[in-house]
C-alpha cells in the first residue's frame, strides 16, 4: 500500500507542469514504483519499479543531481534507458514517501539549477500536502 497512491491524478498534473516548464521528462514515485510521468516515455515508465539506487538516494534524504563525467544512475529496476538527472525526496513528518525526478537518456543528462529548485519545491509541497 502506498500513501502516495491517492495522489496519482494530482501528481500527474504536477508532472505535466514540470514537463511544460522545463521540457524535461518529469516523474513522481512512491517508495517502490513510478506513479506519474510526463514527457516522451510515459507508457514505458508508468508503474515501473524504481531502481535500488534510487531507493538509496531517497533514503539519504538529500537532493541528488547528476554531475558530468559520473556514470548515470538508472531510474527503473532492470531498465537502462532512463537515468536520474535530478532527484528530490518527498518527506512527510520525517518519513520518505517518494521522490520527484527529472530523467533522461544517459547521453542527455545535464539538469541545472532550475530543475534542482523545481524538484525541491514540488517535493516539499507534496510532503506538506501529505501531512494535512
Locations of regions flagged by a protein language model:
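Juxtadomain coupling helices with adjacent low-complexity linkers
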Residues: 3-19, 46-56, 64, 101-132
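Structured interaction and signal-relay segments at domain junctions
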Residues: 12-79
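Fold-independent oxyanion-binding glycine-rich loops
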Residues: 67-69, 90, 105
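Short amphipathic alpha-helical interaction segments
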Residues: 78-82, 111-114
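A short beta-strand signature within small-molecule sensing/ligand-binding domains used
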Residues: 79-91
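Short hydrophobic/glycine-rich mini-motifs in sensory/regulatory modules
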Residues: 90-100
Amino acid at each position: 500500500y502506498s500513501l502516495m497512491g491517492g495522489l496519482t491524478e494530482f501528481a500527474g498534473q504536477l508532472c505535466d507542469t514540470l514537463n511544460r516548464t522545463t521540457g524535461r521528462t518529469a516523474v513522481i514515485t512512491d517508495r517502490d514504483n513510478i506513479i506519474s510521468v510526463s514527457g516522451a516515455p510515459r507508457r514505458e515508465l508508468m508503474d515501473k519499479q524504481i531502481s535500488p539506487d534510487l531507493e538509496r538516494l531517497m533514503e539519504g534524504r538529500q537532493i541528488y543531481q547528476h554531475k558530468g563525467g559520473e556514470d548515470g544512475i538508472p531510474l527503473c529496476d532492470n531498465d537502462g534507458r532512463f537515468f536520474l538527472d535530478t532527484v528530490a525526496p518527498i518527506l512527510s513528518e520525517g518519513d520518505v514517501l517518494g521522490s520527484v525526478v527529472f530523467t533522461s537518456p544517459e547521453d542527455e543528462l545535464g539538469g541545472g539549477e532550475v530543475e534542482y529548485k523545481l524538484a525541491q519545491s514540488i517535493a516539499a509541497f507534496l510532503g506538506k500536502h501529505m501531512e494535512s
